Amino acid sequence: MIWTRLPLYGPSKPSTGGWQPLRFDGGAFHVKGTAELARALLVLRLCAWPPLVTHGLAFQAWSQRLLGSRLSGALLRASIYGQFVAGETAEEVRNCVGQLQALGLQPLLAVPTEEEPDSTAKTSEVWYEENLSAMLRCVDLSRALVDAHGPARNSLMQLKVTALASTRLCKELSAWIQRPRGSSELSPERLAEAMDSGRNLQLSCLSTEQNQHLQASLSRLHRVAQHARAKCVRLLVDAEYTFINPALSLLVAALAVRWNSPEEGGPWVWNTYQAYLKDTHQRLEQDAEAAHKAGLAFGVKLVRGAYLDKERSMTQLQGKEDCTQPDYEATSRSYSRCLELMLRCVSNHGPPCHLMVASHNEESVRQATKRMWELGIPLDGPVCFGQLLGMCDHVSLALGQAGYMVYKSIPYGCLEEVIPYLIRRAQENRSVLQGARREQALLSQELWRRLLGRTA
């Protein structure tokens, strides 16, 4: 077993009525305006239409040719962009976050920049340096938003590694890590030392040019983490495709060695675990134990996963064994096991162990809230919840109004940059978008109630 100490959080003493499950029946929609609800219903129905998701970029180009850039842009701003994006300027982001804060929700900013996973073109260092500047600005904005609206410990932001290091490099590193002797040359401690000292690494598995890019990438990651720590902003590193995940995990582990000391208020760097992968529970257990033995704090964002369709098609093309769970039910069981593992970790170790329950699934959220009550984990403790901006508001609002810490993942930026990013996210989250029928039904029900003038 991983945890041998007595729990820091004792079992809750049942209240008079016992544990009361949250109601995700749309009752929380009363705090939203009618125009907001109508837009949400329209956009979610559009996003559940497979041809629009599959050919999103083509539809965008067609609308620009037919309507012109200005009118096409205005329609997008009034619909998809307005639903899922905070805005372009810092002031627009502040206004969006202020509205969320008034509803009991917190911001989790995301810079919508990444390298295409199947890109073969070489990207210049200038692009990665520009992304570094964007990430540093995101840290500043995340802190400024918290200064205005809440305690500093609640400041989080997302970090995409492939915005700072090339996919090609991550593929090379992942392939080397998976070799029998490859991991000995690529230890987290060695990378952490290189980040801190700035001394060049010369890895035998990489060419001279790749070693130079690795050093530059380590420097960029270190600068973001250093700036985030100085501003008291926690970094949640996004998971990506399985063929580069070993490299991402190594880089996150290196950052953790440097920045996740409990004495410094860690974890400042969290990793993301995807429950749709067969080995996730085992890896999560191993990583939790490794962090505990090393005396490090441990931060986890737990998701079901967004790359299922592409992962399976890539596996078939390569003739490899499928690493994903066979169906949605198996993924849900995996998520439930990982959730239980992490909640017990939080119960036993307290603040050095942090968890974000990043799920749109009502049953997973109910399980988390019930187990938090049973384990005595306080609502303002190390467990929080996460959903996408513009989706799953009936769950987010119910959680926020009940006093839980809830974050909305918030992309921001100009229309030209964000729309392709949103289309890629929609293609990756097809099952989530098509499965949002209940949310659509609740939105429709609330709109009809208002139209007919009925009381809630």
UniProtKB/Swiss-Prot annotation:
Q: Name one GO cellular component term.
A: mitochondrion
Q: What class of enzyme is it?
A: oxidoreductase
Please give one Pfam family short name. Answer: Pro_dh
A molecular function (GO) term: oxidoreductase activity, acting on the CH-NH group of donors
Which positions does the record annotate as the modified residue N6-acetyllysine? K310, K320
Q: Which keywords label this protein?
A: Acetylation, FAD, Flavoprotein, Oxidoreductase, Proline metabolism
Give the E.C. number(s): 1.5.5.3, 1.5.5.2
> What domain of life does the native source organism fall in?
Eukaryota
The induction annotation reads:
In liver, by TCF1 and HNF4A.
Q: What is this protein called?
A: Hydroxyproline dehydrogenase
Please name the source species.
Mus musculus
The uppermost taxa in this organism's lineage are: Eukaryota, Metazoa, Chordata, Craniata, Vertebrata
